[in-house]
């Protein structure tokens, strides 16, 4: 998901909805800002009778430039958390997508199975943390916009506009798929643990028909869920 390209569109949209008639920035500027800052003469609104059309346009353009910079600052604070957490989740997902994870012969000891069960728990925790950063995104974005001294009414409007661009249906679907995917791997590891060293070196791994059927079903479910998750990642560029 890329949001910097949306900032100008947001500004244009807000400008067409009457926000040009309300303050864009809060009265008191932040103590420390990036290099872009409005000239005092541009921020202070001259009387309408004395302000020429060119001056009004220049003032609005300068305020818009400052606002664009501050929206970028605020959105970066929120998006960096989401991006970092998505990276952690993708890394953990990649471990479990390897075909070796479906082969019982890759486990030399029962302790290795237990270690992977711990990794499954960490995978689930990463999924849960990712869901939380998305869930907190709206509140965190508005707080970040207010910290950038954007006027409250405008901050709320910008927050709503940006948050509406999130692919929420796919985010929820991905969260559900990941929980299901983790559950399948948990079941597979339990199957290996319960049938320790009863498998063959090549397929079919299990002589017991029910165990083999359970194994094959889990492998198919893991593969299918994994493909759906990858499709969503490619579609939405998480």
Language-model-detected regions and their locations in the chain:
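Primarily heptad-repeat coiled-coil rod domains in cytosolic scaffolding/tethering proteins
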Residues: 55, 62, 66, 104, ...
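A structural signal for well-ordered alpha-helices, especially hydrophobic packing surfaces
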Residues: 71, 75, 79-82, 86, ...
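Positively charged n-region of N-terminal signal peptides that target proteins for export
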Residues: 1-5
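Extended amphipathic alpha-helical interaction segments
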Residues: 102-202
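Bacterial N-terminal signal peptides
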Residues: 7-15
